[in-house]
Amino acid sequence: MSAAELAIEAHGLTRRFGNVVAVDDIALSIPRGRIYGFLGPNGSGKSTTIRMLCGLIKPSSGTIRVLGLEMPRQVEALRRRVGYMTQRFSLWEDLSARENLAFMASIYTLEARHAAQRIAAAIAEYRLQEFLDRPAGTLSGGQKQRLALAAATLHEPQLLLLDEPTSAVDPQSRRDFWESLFALTAGGTTILVSTHYMDEAERCHGLAILDLGRIVASGTPTQLMQDLPLQVVEIEAADPTAVRAALRGLASLRSLAQLGLRLHALLAPPAAQAGSPTGALPGGQGEGDGVEQVRALLARAGIVATVRKAPPSLEDVFVGATLSAGATPH
């Protein structure tokens, strides 16, 4: 992909705060007109990376180009072309929704007639009429979110940076918010959004999973699920606690989660176990298909259960990518 087709390009991007490495040698190539997601736990480097990309903080090392501009050297030229929305509501709570939009239009130095047109369009697009003259501080989480998105897009930015924008809203508001994002990309806007919600990550055209400041997996959500290097096995039994205790003896087990009466297990595949005793069942069972391993182990323990392969989910990808080597299954 050529540089002209990329909205964001970064190489060797690193940020240190004293002895702490918050972002560690990240590389990014994000195409224009797409929604790209950062998925990761708190402290994984998502927010720090976004702040470097928009010029709010300088990298310790590495190179960044955003919309063809070199960061942070050309940050002033970038400001009018980028919208930024933080997790915390950052508009003025003592001003009404209408006054906030007018104030943001002045910050973006929009000409008066154009500002009036853009404000009217934002009011209609994001359904702000019902609370237009109420102080922003009195609005619900979903209403604040709609107002913040309207303000962030008032100047029609080419790139929209969203740092966990849906963390304080209800599921319906989140769903509506994402419909608005797809409408923006249909108009040519590129969007980079950080999240810790799996369903939101699945909506992205492309995705990077971050952990401890590094990108540990990247690709489309479908590709990441298809390429998961772990076997997914589901076990259903009357006594999940007994199953959990029995599976503790399976050295190939990488993760175990309970869903009602079902247990959802991630196992290292036979190829990853070759030449290593980690895939062997207690008592010398040896390697093999994950389903057969689990069935044999439960049979030896006298546990009646239904065991089957399951398709991987994005949560499985996330767990597999962020699970450190030798971590205790959970």
Positions of predicted regions on the chain:
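Conserved catalytic motifs of ABC-family nucleotide-binding domains
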Residues: 156
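Catalytic Walker B motif of ABC-type/P-loop ATPase nucleotide-binding domains
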Residues: 160-163
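Conserved ABC ATPase signature
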Residues: 94, 135-139
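Conserved ABC transporter NBD signature motif
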Residues: 62-73, 77-78
